[in-house]
């Protein structure tokens, strides 16, 4: 069973946490109270001392008789500062076997008021009282779940012995009549699977070249010489020009014959003139 728990801590008045056997305190938050007038930083400290076994067994001891405790630990669990850090989230669990005191420590801690809040989980006979409790820190809560699971599934020794004693009837397969096995030599044609024949693709038609008739052949033969005559003649090797070839060797002859021509061109003298020259001589 879970119960809300809240208290106020000041520097002058620390808080002692008192839990019954089987209880757990879950501290969740620390907030600066609106009535607080403190300034600066203040440390929230948990002073923890372990309870001895003798003290746990002797519950009827008078409160006046106090034995000194040696195992005392002071642990700061949070820092608060007015105007900057007004609250802090905590997740701390304390059980009944711990004696806890919450204090405020600071140089200027006067006037600070801090509120602590959380929940107390109460136990009865080492088990959780709340059936719907989902807290993992409940004492023996996991053991209760294991017991419930065993009862649900029926994992007990008696069930195993009873299951061994039970006889399981044997199942007998019904007898089948024996018949002759006939072998089929050939499969009838009607039952054979007809494989579809592939469709034939028509081949493209080839263009037929028409052969020329006889009159056309004659015309073609007559046209062949004409075509041959019309073809340009092949370029023959260039011959030397006649004028140049003739003039080239004849030039020296003309020069040699030129004096002869000059003599021939002279007019023959008359015989009378020759005779006159002889007489003078």
UniProtKB/Swiss-Prot annotation:
Gene3D superfamilies: Nucleoplasmin core domain (2.60.120.340). GO terms for biological process: cellular response to heat. Residues 180-209 have a biased composition (Basic and acidic residues). The keyword Iron-sulfur does not apply. The keyword Ribonucleoprotein does not apply. Residues 142-281 are annotated as: Disordered. This is 32 kDa heat shock protein.
